[in-house]
């Protein structure tokens, strides 16, 4: 099993078969370094499952970015329009969307 699948199954307590069924319904996307996939101002609802790369989740307070967490292979990001966080790629990334 690929590393991102192992981590995803372990972290979210789901079976590999269930994850593969979900991934079959999703599109594999390639993201460039510096790409914003979610922000407090983006009216989008989406789910990303990270296959490779590093992403930065942050919030902006008083004009300064404050790190919330870093994401990598096997992490999932649920982006929704009421989020106060932004997510930006720090490296080239591959994800399911």
Describe the predicted segments one by one:
Residues 1-27, 75:
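Cyclic nucleotide-binding regulatory module and flanking cytosolic helices
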Residues 26, 44-45, 66:
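Short coil/loop residues immediately preceding or within conserved phosphate-binding loops
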Residues 29-31, 71:
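Hydrophobic residues at beta-strand termini and immediately following loops
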Residues 34, 45-56, 73-75:
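Glycine- and acidic-residue-biased ligand/ion/polar-headgroup-sensing regions
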Residues 37-42:
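Short phosphate-coordinating micro-motif centered on Lys-Gly-acidic
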Residues 55-66:
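A short beta-strand-loop-beta hairpin characteristic of the jelly-roll/cupin
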Residues 66-97:
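Cyclic-nucleotide recognition modules
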């Amino acid at each position: 099993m690929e590393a991102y699948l192992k981590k995803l199954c372990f972290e979210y307590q789901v079976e590999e078969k269930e994850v593969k069924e979900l991934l079959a319904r999703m599109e594999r996307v390639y993201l460039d370094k510096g790409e914003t996939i979610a922000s407090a101002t983006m009216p989008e609802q989406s789910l990303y499952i990270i296959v490779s790369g590093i992403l930065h989740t942050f919030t902006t307070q008083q004009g300064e970015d404050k790190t919330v967490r870093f994401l990598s292979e096997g992490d999932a990001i649920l982006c929704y329009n009421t989020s106060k966080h932004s997510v930006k790629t720090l490296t080239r990334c591959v994800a399911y969307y």
